[in-house]
Amino acid sequence: MQFERSDRVSEEIKKELSDIIQHDLKDPRLCAELISIVKVNMSKDLRHAKVYVSIFDKDKEKVETTMKALENAKPYIRREISRRISLRFTPEITFELDDSIEYGARISQILNQLNIPKEDENIEESEGEEEN
């Protein structure tokens, strides 16, 4: 499978963004342990990057505050990316909230509440009935 340059650049930007958020941003509105970069989509010309961010917090107000803090930090983040990654043009960054991890956790919780017996238990029960 052949990877396009935009795929390689998006992975590199994802790695650098995670590092910048975890170690460099000092905004008190950001709780870096609760922020995860899920995906980065690059345009073909590498001038635009759409960054999908997941924030692990149930308080919607804190999530909105964190997103605003990321928006305010965009110039700094863009400058850091241009310093760390050698590109002809530093991409314009757009942050999007991604709640797919939260959605997956909710589905997992619902499935666990269904009390479906595990397959191993079903096999053991059917073997016991065959012996009788």
Swiss-Prot record:
InterPro entries linked: KH_dom-like_a/b, RbfA, RbfA_dom_sf, Ribosome-bd_factorA_CS
Entries under SUPFAM superfamilies matching the protein: Ribosome-binding factor A, RbfA
Keyword Cytoplasm included in the entry's annotation: yes
Record-level GO cellular component terms: cytosol
Sorted UniProt keywords: Cytoplasm, Ribosome biogenesis
Function according to Swiss-Prot or TrEMBL: One of several proteins that assist in the late maturation steps of the functional core of the 30S ribosomal subunit. Associates with free 30S ribosomal subunits (but not with 30S subunits that are part of 70S ribosomes or polysomes). Required for efficient processing of 16S rRNA. May interact with the 5'-terminal helix region of 16S rRNA.
Subunit structure: Monomer. Binds 30S ribosomal subunits, but not 50S ribosomal subunits or 70S ribosomes.
UniProt name for this protein: Ribosome-binding factor A
Designated gene of the protein: rbfA
